[in-house]
Amino acid sequence: MTCNNIFPISILRSGIKPLLSNDHILSFYKKFSSALISRMWKFKRAKNSRYEDSDFLRVFFFSELLGRSIHDTSELLNAYLLSKKRGRRKIFSDGRRKREIPHQTEVNKYLRKIGLQKARNILRECLDKQLLEALDNGLISSKVNVLIDFTEHPYYGRRDDRLIKGTNRQKGTKKMRHYLGFSLLSRDTHLYAGLRQVATGQSKIPIIIKFLDHLLDLGFELKYVLMDREFYRAELLDEIKGMGGDAIIPAKNYKTIKRFVKEYLEGKRGRVSSYTFSSAVEARCRFIAHVNLIIKAKRGFSLRGVKRKYQQGEITLKEARHRVFTIMTTQKPRGKESSWASRTSLFYRRRWMIETGFSDLNRINRRWKSNHDGVRYLDMLARMLLYNSWKMNKKRLQTPHKKGMSSPNWTLNQNQDFLRVTFLSDYEKLHGVVG
């Protein structure tokens, strides 16, 4: 890959430039830099050091934009800037040539100074800034839906501590890093809002409650909280209801749930049932959650069809149960019960947006192999900022178009290309590069 290839195919003729102001294109990067540099004050640089903190961060962030390693990015940027500069390149007495960009080893050494707790605080501060910017610009509303899910990153090293957990779902290893992700969905815009690495034996419920409290402190209101069945806790549903939100979560096939499904198939019960479940009897603090259970047919089947075939004896009870699923919500039925049940169960499908979002994060760059948890956190933060930038710019481009008019299909690759152009343009001005 030559140094000229860091410039993507020009997209400036597409009419996009006037709609995306430079003020907010790279505002997330500026916030990231200031948040990180402000926490590096105790690490004194050598008097003869020719690089500033921002130089190391530019290499790191541009590596995420390029989707390349720190080494490749450092060499590409260095070759590109030197090709644009006039004059001879200085050669030191030991044969080394003067660089314009810090080397990979220096960048990695700088990033490793950032511990796990600092990285968590930086992630929290940067994502908060981006969410509030989206709110101020009208891209999302103050009433948001929260999506919660886990993601796993395989680990191939020799560490054996609480932050490295066991798994049987990864190829070539039985170890992983376990991350709990949070995202917001509002006005059809999906933005990442938080991330937390979960240790072995650590309860996820306090982490979720703390995050939701933080959202309320930022000025947001909860509408729905969409979760998978692994978050099936009465305590959590009770807390969400107390915060003014409603939870939607798949129901586990306990005896009571199976009985409700059987009674519905036999015509003794409706598709919506009131259900009360609680935490274990031996728990220190017992919580009780009152929910509404919704029975819904799986894709390719109709609820009436499954019920009719069961009553006519065409399928067994076991087959009928495999064709339906149950979800529960703390929200009370509104309007016509059957319509409300269909709307609620269909809306739950949007929980998959956080899982497809994790796939998009992996498209931005390959996963780092760094053994430092703080560096891995910064890598995930950079990807989330770039993902949110894509979603926010896509929403900005859709806003000027009237209803009925086709809006530009702004893809992740287009957004990455546009950010590279803007990033390099600012970088050239900073280094005094002659066009």
What is each of the regions a protein language model found here?
Residues V59, T73-S74, H103, V107, ...:
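Short, conserved catalytic/metal-binding motifs centered on acidic residues
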Residues N168-E221, R321:
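Electropositive, glycine- and tryptophan-enriched low-complexity nucleic-acid-binding patches
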Residues N108-L185:
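Active-site-proximal, Lys/Arg-enriched surface segment
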